[in-house]
């Protein structure tokens, strides 16, 4: 079942996001359906994604995202991820 995920990182910046994206590359990860990011209305940086499953999002997070943060020296505790089931999505 597809899931949506949101991360609001109050410490996030466009510069950090751009560095992470450059390191990860622009290829869609396995299980990734949709990705959007920008300044959070609460300050910091917000990412919203749709994944084929929460397990695929977790695999990407564990195997690629966290190692990228460490490589770039951004290895504080990651902000919490919020998941919910997707009933409908338009592309």
Spell out what each predicted region is.
Residues 1-63, 73-91:
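Short S/T/G/P-rich N-terminal loop/turn motif that feeds into the first structured element of a domain
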């Amino acid at each position: 079942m597809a899931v949506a995920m949101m991360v609001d990182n109050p410490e996030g910046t466009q510069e950090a996001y751009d560095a992470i994206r450059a390191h990860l590359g622009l290829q869609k990860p396995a299980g990734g359906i949709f990705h959007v990011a920008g300044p959070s209305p609460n300050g910091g940086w917000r990412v919203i994604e749709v994944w084929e499953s929460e397990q695929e999002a977790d695999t990407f997070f564990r195997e690629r995202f966290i190692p990228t943060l460490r490589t770039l020296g951004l290895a504080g505790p990651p902000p919490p991820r919020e998941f919910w089931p997707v009933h409908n999505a338009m592309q």
